[in-house]
């Protein structure tokens, strides 16, 4: 790898980073200017937060996170999204109204989020989980964590190594982390 190659981000990262930033800015402008119906905007924010993180997990973009430059770019975006979550978690515009038939003291009401912007914490929590699992993976095997979704064989084409059982377990755990962080308070 030449010096010029190390300064460039992979095209898949440029595309995902660009889309993530542009869509996030579009949502911010849309909210402030009232360009999108608030009900639809809250749904879009939920899918946006969940979708970006799932994209990182399911595609070769997960392998790119082993590069600290790329990881810290995503960490900065995750911190910005987390700040927006903190700023909006009590905002009535993003409130989820549940059926009156649901017991207010039930497990569901105690742990499931009551705002759509709670999904904005997903990227940060995912990245923390990724860093922990990738560190464990490197200590145990000497290899970085691979994405196992969409793989048609036990060989990873991008990295050119076999997918291990640990890759699969950590991918499943990261998927659970995404779901839980998107839906819980």
Regions found by a protein language model. Name each.
Residues 5-10, 70, 99-120, 154-163:
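Membrane-interface segments at the starts/ends of alpha-helical transmembrane spans
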Residues 9-18, 41-44, 65-74:
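Membrane-interfacial loop-to-transmembrane alpha-helix junctions, especially the N-terminal start
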Residues 12-27, 37, 111-133, 169-178:
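Alpha-helical transmembrane segments
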Residues 26-37, 57-63, 84-99, 180-185:
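Juxtamembrane "helix-exit" motif on the non-cytosolic side of transmembrane helices
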Residues 46-70:
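Canonical alpha-helical transmembrane segments
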Residues 47-48, 68-86, 160-166:
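Transmembrane alpha-helical segments of multi-pass membrane proteins
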Residues 132-185:
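C-terminal membrane-adjacent module
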